[in-house]
């Protein structure tokens, strides 16, 4: 319930407004603005009593108005119960008559917010501008709907169909709560909505209706729960929002798949809507452009492009061009139907979206050399269809000079397997820019690490060209309590501004998140990854100190988890090149200061238990994931380990390091004499650059040796006794663990 201004219950109404003229009667709730009553709300605990609720609310308003001390123009009736959902009716007193409060041509179906109330009173014509639900509201509603479908025992793969079908039915009209055939009514309303479209062919209408019909065999158990789902969607003012510029279906469906119980098991991942808009804004679209997304999902990219085109359109001729402008493919029938609906809900979409694979020979040839813009977020790790094939197919669809923007798994741009492809790509096309995206962009639905690729089709990379490299680590959302919620510090506006400046030939100042590199350094299949090229921010003593504390804390956590590990502490763990010291305040590759080796052990399960630390790529306990017996193992001779994901740890004990598989540990052997404090300094230098390494771009030796480190500005001869500190910690821990 939106409380807007002052929110008063029955007794509070009596205390604050004793002169309303109501006698002993009082409404359930009154809402005030600036101390003046503006809304009356009356509630009933049965769904069928919704007319009573709104009639009583209007009657209270009229009595108060006749008293002439206050004028209340908004009445709200609420009826229902948790198990069946709620109906909300909002009326406005216009010229002495009560009318539905309207937004975008549809009745408002939720308790209005303060902003919506102010808008209604300002217009004074029984209309308002509904506030688009926030990300949090979409998430909460999606979780509720998903839980209802789970309770109704609707199969996971069939749940998205319910969302699409009910949304389409509500788009067509209001659903009668007294009906005895709720599924039948919803199917009939969905069918009517699609059949009335002037932009779908008869064949596509039939296919859409087939894809969206809720059959009794699969959905018969849903009937007792359907009104709750309708209630939740109405709470979001679905009918009014569908008529606005907001991508209601896309935003709700994205939240539904991300946060609904079991829904991520469907393996469907869609690009967040603020990222599809960002991608559209990066390259821009114009009236007359043809736009394609060959793996369009629910149509996020197409909706963003379509909406951008509508803003540029000022005449009927432009509208006709827009109707023919967007094309897409998706293989999932339900997802395909939702993408068609998404364009349908935009009002002018012709929906040139096909339910087939874009990689099939016929489909691929049908779109070759026809488009000005291609957008893409291909399936991640799909067997037999690597991401590069979708990129190639997108580039084929473009005319010469057409622009491509793709959100793609970052491994394509970093790993050795795709080196030849990267080299070949720049022979055929122009790589314009790369922007790495936040690691948690798809949380909690997927853990894919992605980057945006921007390219110009069928124009070989000019030798003297520049390439824009950006690192987007804040997209305006953060992880909080299992959700991604809005936060401050959004980099997207700045990144967009700098990219446009780059495209227009302006000077780009090198920073910690943006750099322009010469194309010749990417020749021969070199990485496209921004993480390889963006410079590292220089650390001050405070930064180093904070990182050092984390390194020390990791050692303490390790001893807490494995107290017997102290038996492997080695007083000589750092005796290297006693007479030679490193150059001071020098920035150079890591290999200048350390030799880099790879661990040689087998998997942990290959060894029996003991007291020797086994170091892998875990994060919580210094990389130590177990203790193994000394017999027949090969101890490491370097005092720093670096995990596959770029985290460096001090290892002041005899230990062994994982050497098999993709998560192999790298071992650093100092080339110079170093004190413990100096080792901590270099560890901090490495850990400050963890952002460079991910599952898609691991800290392999060839990358690690080129990592830029800056040596200390002075020698730290006054050292710390790390062995003594850790031994003391173990003793104190044992004492505190005693129960007396």
PLM ranges: what are they?
Residues 2-35:
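Active-site metal-binding core of divalent-cation-utilizing nuclease and nuclease-like domains
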Residues 29-31, 35-46, 60:
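Conserved catalytic cores of phosphodiester-cleaving nucleases, focusing on short active-site segments
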Residues 48-97:
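Nucleic-acid nuclease catalytic cores
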């Amino acid at each position: 319930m939106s409380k807007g201004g002052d929110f008063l219950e029955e007794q509070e109404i009596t205390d604050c407004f004793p002169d309303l003229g109501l006698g002993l009667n009082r409404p359930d709730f009154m809402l005030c603005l600036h101390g003046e009553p503006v809304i009356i709300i009356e509630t009933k605990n049965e769904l069928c009593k919704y007319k009573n609720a709104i009639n009583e609310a209007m009657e209270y308003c009229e009595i108060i108005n006749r008293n002439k001390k206050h004028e209340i123009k908004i009445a709200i009736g609420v009826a229902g119960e948790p198990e069946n959902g709620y109906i909300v009716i909002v009326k406005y007193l216009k010229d002495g008559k009560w009318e539905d409060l309207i937004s975008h041509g549809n009745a408002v179906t939720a308790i209005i917010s303060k902003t919506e109330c102010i808008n209604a009173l300002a217009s004074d014509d029984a209309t308002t501008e509904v506030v688009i639900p926030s990300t949090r509201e979409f998430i909460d509603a999606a979780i509720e709907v998903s839980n209802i479908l789970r309770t109704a025992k609707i199969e996971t793969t069939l749940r998205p169909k319910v969302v699409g079908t009910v949304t389409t039915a509500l788009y067509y009209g209001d659903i009668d709560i007294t009906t005895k055939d709720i599924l039948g009514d919803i199917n009939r309303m969905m069918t009517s909505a699609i059949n009335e479209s002037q932009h779908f062919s008869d064949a596509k209408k039939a296919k859409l209706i087939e894809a969206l019909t809720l059959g009794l065999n699969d959905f018969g158990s849903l009937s007792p729960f359907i009104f709750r789902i309708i209630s939740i969607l109405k709470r979001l003012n679905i009918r009014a929002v569908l008529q606005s510029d907001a991508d209601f279906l896309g935003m709700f469906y994205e939240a539904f798949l991300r946060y609904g119980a079991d829904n991520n098991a469907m393996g469907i991942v869609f690009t967040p809507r603020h990222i599809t808009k960002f991608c559209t804004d990066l390259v821009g679209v114009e009236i007359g452009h043809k736009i394609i997304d060959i793996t369009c999902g629910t149509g996020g990219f197409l909706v963003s492009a379509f909406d951008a085109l509508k803003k540029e359109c000022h005449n009927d001729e432009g509208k006709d061009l827009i109707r023919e402008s967007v094309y897409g493919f998706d293989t999932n029938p339900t997802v395909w139907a939702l993408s068609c609906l998404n364009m349908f809900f935009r009002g002018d979409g012709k929906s040139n979206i096909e339910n087939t694979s874009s990689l099939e020979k016929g489909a691929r040839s049908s779109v070759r050399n026809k488009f000005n813009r291609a957008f893409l977020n291909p399936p991640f790790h799909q067997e037999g269809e690597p991401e590069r094939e979708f990129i190639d197919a997108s580039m084929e669809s473009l005319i010469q000079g057409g622009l491509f923007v793709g959100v793609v798994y970052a491994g394509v741009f970093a790993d050795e397997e795709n080196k030849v492809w990267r080299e070949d790509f720049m022979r055929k096309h122009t790589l314009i820019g790369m922007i790495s995206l936040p690691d948690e962009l798809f949380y909690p639905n997927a853990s894919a690490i992605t980057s945006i690729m921007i390219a110009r089709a069928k124009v070989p990379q000019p030798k003297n060209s520049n390439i824009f490299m950006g690192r987007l680590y804040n997209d305006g959302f953060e992880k909080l309590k299992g959700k991604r919620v809005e936060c401050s510090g959004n980099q997207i506006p700045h990144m967009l501004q700098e990219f446009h400046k780059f495209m227009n030939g302006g000077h780009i100042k090198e920073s910690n998140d943006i750099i322009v590199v010469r194309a010749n350094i990417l020749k021969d299949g070199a990485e496209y990854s921004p993480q390889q090229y963006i410079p590292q921010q220089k650390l001050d003593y405070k930064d180093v100190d904070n990182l050092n504390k984390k390194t020390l804390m990791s050692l303490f956590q390790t001893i807490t988890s494995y107290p017997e590990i102290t038996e492997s502490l080695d007083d000589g763990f750092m005796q290297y090149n006693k007479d030679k010291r490193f150059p001071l305040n020098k920035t150079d590759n890591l290999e200048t200061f350390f030799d880099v080796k790879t661990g040689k052990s087998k998997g942990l399960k290959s060894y029996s238990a003991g007291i020797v630390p086994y170091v892998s790529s875990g994060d919580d306990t210094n990389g130590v994931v177990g203790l193994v017996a000394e017999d027949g193992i090969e101890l490491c001779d370097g005092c720093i380990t670096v995990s596959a994901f770029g985290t460096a740890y001090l290892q002041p004990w005899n230990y062994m390091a994982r050497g098999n598989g993709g998560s192999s540990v790298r071992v650093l052997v100092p080339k110079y004499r170093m004190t413990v404090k100096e080792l901590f300094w270099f560890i901090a230098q490495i850990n400050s650059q963890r952002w460079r390494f991910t599952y898609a771009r691991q800290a392999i030796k060839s990358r690690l040796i080129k990592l830029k480190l800056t040596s200390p500005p002075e020698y730290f001869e006054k050292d710390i006794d790390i062995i003594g500190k850790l031994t003391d910690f173990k003793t104190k821990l044992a004492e505190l663990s005693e129960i007396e």
